[in-house]
């Protein structure tokens, strides 16, 4: 892995205040991003930009993955749901943070990406993950409730069923909107949902059935 390239990117993100937690820094440095992009884009893997992964989907920029991990306040042992596996890169970073005592359920709507991400994640030895092919907007009740839920694609609103699958005290993070999108942090406290608008973003649209 071109560690020096990622060190440079992560150092810059820390200096700019995007990343504060040591666990997020360590996770970003541990996951070889170039292994989660198409071969012809491997040389661009450590540029802090979104990259095409085919089928109209992208891998998020490094700073966005870092910001989302920070805002989710991830910790070891948590039960996490990811909507939109993509190439599996974001999932790998999350798995590094929640550790072997944690559990990640991730759902991908594009069959080809589901297949390649599952193969890739298992190849790197992650065995506390369940990769599911299907409509992520329905969540996955079988592994609920979740301590953390995050979406890697934007919809007009967050499906209510996802809030139902969120633990009390849990956090849900999602890009919301169509042309103008915002990353919104939802917190479930005593059964009530509170939201905080974090920043303007640009994500691919959420695919629904």
From Swiss-Prot:
This is Protein-L-isoaspartate O-methyltransferase. Coiled coil: none annotated. PANTHER family: PROTEIN-L-ISOASPARTATE O-METHYLTRANSFERASE (PTHR11579), PROTEIN-L-ISOASPARTATE(D-ASPARTATE) O-METHYLTRANSFERASE (PTHR11579:SF0). The gene is pcm. One of its GO terms (biological process) is methylation. Belongs to the methyltransferase superfamily. L-isoaspartyl/D-aspartyl protein methyltransferase family. InterPro entries: PCMT, SAM-dependent_MTases_sf. It is an enzyme of class 2 (transferase). The active site is at residue 60. Its main location: cytoplasm. It comes from Methanococcus vannielii (strain ATCC 35089 / DSM 1224 / JCM 13029 / OCM 148 / SB). Catalyzes the methyl esterification of L-isoaspartyl residues in peptides and proteins that result from spontaneous decomposition of normal L-aspartyl and L-asparaginyl residues. It plays a role in the repair and/or degradation of damaged proteins. HAMAP family: PIMT. The keyword S-adenosyl-L-methionine applies. CDD domains: AdoMet_MTases (cd02440). The lineage of its organism: Archaea, Methanobacteriati, Methanobacteriota, Methanomada group, Methanococci. It is found in: Cytoplasm. It catalyses: [protein]-L-isoaspartate + S-adenosyl-L-methionine = [protein]-L-isoaspartate alpha-methyl ester + S-adenosyl-L-homocysteine. One of its GO terms (cellular component) is cytoplasm.
